[in-house]
Regions:
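Structured helix-beta-strand junction loops
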Residues: 107-108, 133
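A generic structural motif
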Residues: 108-109, 185
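N-terminal helical cap/lid subdomain that shapes the substrate entry/recognition surface
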Residues: 2-99, 106-107
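Asp-based, Mg2+/Mn2+-dependent phosphohydrolase catalytic module
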Residues: 1-5, 9, 102, 114, ...
Length: 209
C-alpha cells in the first residue's frame, strides 16, 4: 500500500465544532423536526441557495431570501439570519486536532484543509483565519466548487503536490468521503475526534494523541 504523505482535514466538524450541531440547536429551539433543515438543503440540490452560498455565488445577505424559499418549499419556516447567528457562534477550534496537525507537519507530512464555507464579515475575501496551521487550504467559496465535487479533492492534492493515493482525508459527513475514496484517498469519518486520530495514527505510523 502506498505510504501516506499528506493528510487533509475538513474544518467544520473536524478541526472545529460542527455547524450541524448549531443547526440542530436552532431546530430544537424553534420546534422544528430534527434534521429537517439538512433535508431541505439536500432537496434543493446544487441549484439551491445553500450550495450557491458555498460556491461563493451568493453573499450571506443575498442568500437569506432564497434559502428561506427553499425551506418553505420543504414545508418549514426558517429565519435565515438567525440560523446563521447560531452557526457563527459555534465554530470553536478543537485543540486536540490542531495539536495533531502540528505533529504531522513536524514529522514531515504535508497537511491541508478542505472546507465548504462562505464569505463572512470576519473574512470576506481573504484566507480563512485558520489557514496558518496548514500547508494548503482550499475553500469552496473561493474556488467555485464544493464537496462532494471530485474536482475539489483533486485540487487540494495538487496544492499539496501529492497523488490522492498518498493522501488521507478526514470529514464528518459520509457523503463527502465517498468521492475521496473513489479517487484513491484513504478516508476517516470523524464522529469522535480522539478515535479519528487513533485511526489516523495507525495510517501514518505514529501517535497523534
Amino acid at each position: 500500500m502506498t505510504a501516506v504523505r499528506a493528510v487533509v482535514f475538513d474544518i467544520g466538524g473536524v478541526i472545529q465544532d460542527s455547524p450541524l450541531h448549531a443547526i440542530a440547536r436552532y431546530e430544537a429551539d424553534h420546534g422544528l423536526p430534527a434534521g429537517v433543515i439538512n433535508r431541505a438543503v439536500v432537496a434543493a440540490g446544487e441549484a439551491g441557495a445553500w450550495s450557491r452560498l458555498e460556491r461563493g455565488e451568493l453573499t450571506v445577505e443575498a442568500w437569506c431570501a432564497p434559502f428561506e424559499r427553499d425551506c418553505r418549499a420543504h414545508g418549514i419556516t426558517v429565519d435565515a439570519r438567525r440560523l446563521m447567528e447560531y452557526i457563527a457562534a459555534a465554530g470553536r477550534e478543537r485543540p486536540v486536532m490542531l495539536r495533531a496537525v502540528d505533529r504531522l507537519r513536524e514529522r514531515g507530512l504535508r497537511v491541508g484543509a478542505l472546507t465548504n464555507n462562505w464569505a463572512t464579515e470576519a473574512a470576506p475575501t481573504g484566507p480563512h483565519p485558520i489557514a496558518r496551521h496548514f500547508d494548503a487550504l482550499v475553500e469552496s467559496r473561493a474556488v467555485g466548487m464544493r464537496k462532494p465535487d471530485p474536482r475539489i479533492y483533486r485540487l487540494i492534492c495538487q496544492h499539496l503536490q501529492v497523488e490522492p493515493a498518498e493522501t488521507a482525508f478526514l470529514d464528518d459527513i459520509g457523503a463527502n468521503l465517498k468521492p475521496a475514496r473513489a479517487l484513491g484517498m484513504r478516508t476517516i469519518k470523524v464522529d469522535d475526534p480522539e478515535q479519528a486520530l487513533r485511526e489516523l495514527g495507525a495510517m501514518v505510523g505514529f501517535d497523534l494523541l
